Amino acid sequence: MKLRPLHDRVIIKRTEVEAKSAGGIVLTGSAAEKSTRGEIVAVGKGRILDNGEVRALDVKAGDKVLFNEGYGVKTEKIDGEEYLIMSESDILAVEE
């Protein structure tokens, strides 16, 4: 299945990072926090402004980002892979 996000939404594949304790022990399962980093795999056409114009997004597919996984973030499994669908405003930074 292929999804195309609408408007100012993006689809992100979470980047898994190895979590370690202060003592260097690798944490797994519930002891490890979920990463808030990922790679954008698809973007919508843009935000619809009050005057009807569409403002293109500042991010693009392939960007590596840091995001806020909050109330408006939807998790979806597609072909066995987990993806996040969120608004561009939930993205905090782009890795350069």
From Swiss-Prot:
This is Co-chaperonin GroES. PROSITE patterns: CHAPERONINS_CPN10 (PS00681). Heptamer of 7 subunits arranged in a ring. Interacts with the chaperonin GroEL. It comes from Idiomarina loihiensis (strain ATCC BAA-735 / DSM 15497 / L2-TR). The lineage of its organism: Bacteria, Pseudomonadati, Pseudomonadota, Gammaproteobacteria, Alteromonadales. It is found in: Cytoplasm. Belongs to the GroES chaperonin family. The keyword Cytoplasm applies. SUPFAM superfamilies: GroES-like. Together with the chaperonin GroEL, plays an essential role in assisting protein folding. The GroEL-GroES system forms a nano-cage that allows encapsulation of the non-native substrate proteins and provides a physical environment optimized to promote and accelerate protein folding. GroES binds to the apical surface of the GroEL ring, thereby capping the opening of the GroEL channel. GO terms for molecular function: ATP binding; metal ion binding; protein folding chaperone; protein-folding chaperone binding; unfolded protein binding. It holds the Pfam family Cpn10. It comes from the Bacteria. GO terms for cellular component: cytoplasm. HAMAP family: CH10. Keywords: Chaperone, Cytoplasm. Its main location: cytoplasm. SMART domains: Cpn10. GO terms for biological process: chaperone cofactor-dependent protein refolding. InterPro entries: Chaperonin_GroES, Chaperonin_GroES_sf, Chaprnonin_Cpn10_CS, GroES-like_sf.
